Amino acid sequence: PKSVYAILKQLKPDKYPKVDDDATILVEYPSATVQIMGSWNWPKGRKDMHIYGSEGYIYQDTPGSMRVYTHRKEKTTLPPKLKEPYNDSFYYLKAAVRKEIQVQPYDLSSLENNLIGVEILESAIKSAKSGKPVRF
């Protein structure tokens, strides 16, 4: 990323007295901006993703399907079924530890990829404290 900007809040201090319970994080890349919103304060748990582009969008409201809009049409698609060990995080970890699979640097569960995630989150905390974007 080029920069990270974040606002962290504590909306329910009586319920979560020691932590921020609401976060909005903007991650700026050369040709895109990602908005991450996370909260323990919402009345309903959410695990959705919305991606907007210049020619359409993708909504993934549930893990089991996504809506793709392009060329003025929306189509619902189902994700492909993953084979073992990729269909279960514990089987995946076991296979990686036993070297039954080769984890690639940009796989979702790779160390390299997750270190980028940690760097983004640490930058979000610094940004929230300073009130300014953290540049990379």
Features from the language model and the residues they span:
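Broad, structure-driven detector of short, well-ordered beta-strand segments within folded domains
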Residues: 56-61
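Short polybasic amphipathic segments
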Residues: 49, 64-73
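Glycine-centered tight beta-turn/hairpin loop motif at sheet-sheet or coil-to-beta transitions
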Residues: 29-33, 55, 72-73
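Active-site loop of classical SDR/Rossmann-like NAD(P)-dependent oxidoreductases
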Residues: 80-92, 109, 116
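A short, sequence-level motif marking secondary-structure junctions
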Residues: 39-43, 63-67, 80-86
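C-terminal helix-rich "cap/oligomerization" subdomain common to oxidoreductases
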Residues: 95-136
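Rossmann-like dinucleotide-binding domain that binds NAD(P)(H)
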Residues: 1-33, 40-44, 112
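Short beta-strand segments
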Residues: 34-36, 47, 76, 134
